[in-house]
Amino acid sequence: MRRIRRGHVLLAAVAAALCLPASGVSSSSDNSTITKVGKTEGQLNLIAWEGYTYKQWVNPFVKATGCKVRSKFGGSSDEMVTLMRTGQYDAVSASGDASLRLIFGKDVRPIDPKLVPDFKNFIPALKSPSHNTVKGVHYGISLQWGPNTLLYNTKKVKPAPNSWSVLYSSKYKGKITVPDNPIQIADAALSLSRSKPNLGIKDPYELTEPQFKAAVDLLKKQHSLVRKYWATAGDEIDLFKNGSATVGASWPYQTNTLQAAKAPVKDLIPKEGATGWADTWMISSKAKHPNCAVKWIQWVSTPKVQAQQAIYFGETPANTKACAIMDKLSKGSCAQYHANAPSAYFRSIKFWKTPTKDCGNGKSNCMDYAKWQQAWTDIKS
């Protein structure tokens, strides 16, 4: 998935210079759990979404730790996985559609969450989520998250929708927009879990062949109704501003940006619930600067940095203590991004995770991510 706030990707140059490992965490290829942090190495090479390494919180980190941050912005989850497997980077801000690929590929190391003091303040749903925690082992620390919401033009879409079914309705042919992402198959599966309960869909990311086929068929029917598959938040904002789209799958950032521009839009979590993304900082099993990587995770988990990033990028912090700081930085932002939402809100969200053959019931007859990628190409053809 492309997780870019603005309309294009900026690539930051990453130097190839590598420092010798310091004591503490070993920097050799290692999949053992990180349980302590030693002397920092003076450098940190990151793969991140654009906006995740902004100077507002990076510069104070460098000053406090001596770890100079060099970041490369990833254009998609697939690109991030590829970059991590080069062994040239220390950590990555992986979304849920990438994290399990890195875990099962042994590309990342487990980390003891006790190393992160603010972990205790995280929302329960993001302490040990299935997209970064396997059999009780934490392969990263959650960072920020956001739901996939149903966005609509209040003047054009009437009555106000309460179901994802509106995205599959011929009534709005040519005015529908959805993300250009294979994980969109999960959104179709979530809709089918309510409209066709006989399919037996319990988890939209664990689909047997018949369930998968039903979701893909629904999306193929939707294809002729779609005005555009959007790649960035800016793409969708433009579609709603110029009237090309009146209803679509979205994120809170788009809604807030459009409402600030006085566009007649609202969003909601439909009755079926919603999918959602959640990012995790994960440390490479080949990290050359692992101690700096741990320090970075500790830093970006603090309430102040979480609040700064949430407002800058347009997302929701994992740390519940960030809410008050968000409102000080931008009045009402805590509620805007659901940082103070009740537990029922989180339960309605099915966070992204990489589809695998494992169906979670001891069987291995689910469709893996490669099948999802191929199907998405077929859907759009």
Language-model segments: what does each one mean?
Residues F346-S381:
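Conserved C-terminal helix/tail region of periplasmic/extracytoplasmic solute-binding proteins
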Residues D30-L102:
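Early extracytoplasmic/lumenal segment of secretory-pathway proteins
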Residues D90-A94, Y229, T246-W251, D267:
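Paired acidic/hydrophobic, glycine-rich loop segments that form the ligand-binding mouth/hinge
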Residues S284-K350:
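Mature extracytoplasmic/periplasmic domains
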Residues S250, Q259-Y312, S381:
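Extracytoplasmic/periplasmic substrate-recognition and gating elements
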Residues I47-A48, Y52-K55, S93-K241:
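Extracytoplasmic ligand-binding site segments that recognize negatively charged/polar headgroups
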Residues M1-Q43:
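Short, low-complexity disordered leader/linker segments with a strong preference
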Residues L102-I111, V134-V137, T257-I269, S333-C334:
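Ligand-binding "clamshell"
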